[in-house]
Amino acid sequence: MQTLKVELGERSYPIHIGEGLLDQPELLTPHIVGRQVAIVSNTTVAPLYLERLTQTLAGYNVLPIVLPDGEAFKNWETLQTIFDGLLTARHDRRTTVIALGGGVIGDMAGFAAACYQRGVNFIQIPTTLLSQVDSSVGGKTGINHPLGKNMVGAFYQPSVVLIDTTSLNTLPERELSAGLAEVIKYGLICDEPFLTWLEEHVDALRGLDQAALTVAIERSCAAKALVVGADERESGVRATLNLGHTFGHAIETHMGYGVWLHGEAVAAGTVMALEMSSRLGWISTQDRDRGIRLFQRAGLPVVPPQDMTEDNFLEHMAIDKKVIDGRLRLVLLRQMGEAVITDDYPKEVLQATLVADYRALVDQLRG
């Protein structure tokens, strides 16, 4: 087992990474404040791991709250289901809410914990690669709004993140690839040697090699923990973690939540960010193509939806958390391994990026 730490003063917390951690109560019980525990999961994950976690928490008053699975249910109505369960079971301010699932469950359970009786204890047990390397670390919680993704939420840190890497053995191939999009992101924005490592090990990662997965998760979490410790509320450097997300969120919103997985949209969105960085002269076309090839090898889409127009993108991108005083800030690459957030770019470069023929670009790479 490896343990990392998110350094936030009195609110610092550990990230435990390893095999079989779901069966080790000593990793959880020090972070549970009372006798009441609510496990929030979904209809896919609960049949696989809920009973196991309940046994690990023997002696506690465990309330299971099982939600429908999917991004389409990351909304106010589903959030109310969590509140209904907590109130009906008379859970008090010393309850602990545990998120057992992927990013959707973690975001909603965390937001519920932040709101319930003005804040109760919260634990993250992420079961997908995407949630293990990204959404479970850093305290971002929330729900989607019909007009924009993750537009309603709060920063609310967990007391511990428990990453049992064996949970990936039941993860569908498409979900695994979606998680790799966020892993690749870390190499692009802050760790070029990690990007090289990923190029060498992407096949092993897709083959669920436990040693390779552990390395990828550790390096991703270490990168995110460092950034969150420096900028918890995304007022500066933390925004660079959103490489590809402005374009990607526009894709998710336009297509309908859940049609494209988050990681799939991030991959296509990151290709657009690479293209724009190249058009600005910040990275070479060879570096752009290097990123595209890695996303392809990870089994991810690298072409945005064909029916999305420039106006579609601009409409959705205007409703983005990085918009300040009406100016759209974008995360781009100054070079491989170095990201910046900026609103200082020619409008025509953004327009050219939005209308670029990505399918022709990919076909050229194949040739």
Swiss-Prot record:
Pathway: Metabolic intermediate biosynthesis; chorismate biosynthesis; chorismate from D-erythrose 4-phosphate and phosphoenolpyruvate: step 2/7. Its main location: cytoplasm. It comes from the Bacteria. One of its GO terms (cellular component) is cytoplasm. NAD(+) binds at residues 69-74, 103-107, 127-128, 140, 149. It catalyses: 7-phospho-2-dehydro-3-deoxy-D-arabino-heptonate = 3-dehydroquinate + phosphate. Its EC number is 4.2.3.4. InterPro entries: Dehydroquinate_synthase, DHQ_synth_AroB, DHQ_synth_fam, DHQS/DOIS_N, DHQS_C. Binds 1 divalent metal cation per subunit. Can use either Co(2+) or Zn(2+). Zn(2+) binds at E182, H245, H262. One of its GO terms (molecular function) is nucleotide binding. It holds the Pfam family DHQS_C. CDD domains: DHQS. It is found in: Cytoplasm. Belongs to the sugar phosphate cyclases superfamily. Dehydroquinate synthase family. PANTHER family: 3-DEHYDROQUINATE SYNTHASE (PTHR43622), 3-DEHYDROQUINATE SYNTHASE, CHLOROPLASTIC (PTHR43622:SF7). Catalyzes the conversion of 3-deoxy-D-arabino-heptulosonate 7-phosphate (DAHP) to dehydroquinate (DHQ). HAMAP family: DHQ_synthase. This is 3-dehydroquinate synthase. It comes from Pseudomonas savastanoi pv. phaseolicola (strain 1448A / Race 6) (Pseudomonas syringae pv. phaseolicola (strain 1448A / Race 6)).
